[in-house]
C-alpha cells in the first residue's frame, strides 16, 4: 500500500520556523515527507535537514518523495532520542525543529496496522513494529485497574471502568485478537444513548495507542531536549491532535518561558531559573475552514510555536 499522508497546517508550520537558507533543521516526525519537502525547498546546498521517524514505511516513502534532495539525513529512531541522535551526527545546535504528532493517513488506512476502529485487523497499533508491546499485549495482559486508568487518563473516556471490566470478562473466554472484537466489546459497554456523538471506540483506541507508543512520556522529554538543542532564536513548532497532547505542550512551554519557582511574596527571583524560550503562539494556530473541509483529519489540529532566547 502506498504511504499517503496529507500534511496538516503545512504553510503555517513552515512559516513558523522562520527558515534560514543555510540553517540546520529537524523534522521529528518525517511521515510522508510533506513538511520536510517544504523545508528543503527553502534551504541552500549548505543547509541541512534531519528527518526522524520510527516507522520504516514512512522513511521508505519519504526517501522516494525527497529523492531529488541530497542535504537530508534519514534516521530510523524515535524523536524521544533527539538529543542522542544529534550527538551521534556530531550536530550541536539546530535552527528549527518540528513535531507533527498525528497518526499518518497511511497508518490509519492500512488495516493491518490496527490503528483504525473502522476496519477489522489484528490488534497492533505500534508506530515502530520492532517494539515488543502491542495493543494485543495491553488488552490481553494488563490488569483491569491498569486498563481503567489508561482509558480514563489517556482517552478521557466516561465509561472507562465499565469498558475495562467488559474487556477482562471477555478475554477470560478467549484472547481478544482483533480491532473488530474490541469495538464490539466497547459498543456493549457504552449505553446506546451515549453512542450518538462520534464513534464509541474513538477514545478507547486513542488511549491504547498512546499507551503502546508511550506518546505522552516521550513528548515531555522531547520538548525539553529539543529546546536545549536550539540555537538562539531557533524555533520549535509542534502540531497536536488531541487535548492531552496540546495540554502537555502548553504547560511545558509555559514552564520553559517562566521557570521561576520562587514564592510570589519574594520581591526578586532567588531560584536562579532563567527563561529559555519565548512563546510565539499565545493561542494555538488552527487549520482554516477550507483546510478542515478538504482534510477532515485536520479538524482537531493545533500548532504551538516557541522561540529560543
Swiss-Prot record:
Statement: the UniProt record of this protein carries the keyword RNA-binding: no
Biological process annotations from GO: rRNA base methylation
Enzyme Commission identifier(s): 2.1.1.199
Main location: cytoplasm
Recorded GO CC terms: cytoplasm
Disulfide cross-links: none
Keyword hit for Membrane: no
Catalytic reaction(s) noted: cytidine(1402) in 16S rRNA + S-adenosyl-L-methionine = N(4)-methylcytidine(1402) in 16S rRNA + S-adenosyl-L-homocysteine + H(+)
Source organism superkingdom: Bacteria
Gene3D superfamilies named in the record: Putative methyltransferase TM0872, insert domain, Vaccinia Virus protein VP39
Physiological role: Specifically methylates the N4 position of cytidine in position 1402 (C1402) of 16S rRNA.
NCBIfam families: 16S rRNA (cytosine(1402)-N(4))-methyltransferase RsmH
HAMAP family to which the protein is assigned, alphabetical: 16SrRNA_methyltr_H
Family statement: Belongs to the methyltransferase superfamily. RsmH family.
The name this protein goes by in its record: Ribosomal RNA small subunit methyltransferase H
Organism: Clostridium botulinum (strain Okra / Type B1)
Gene: rsmH
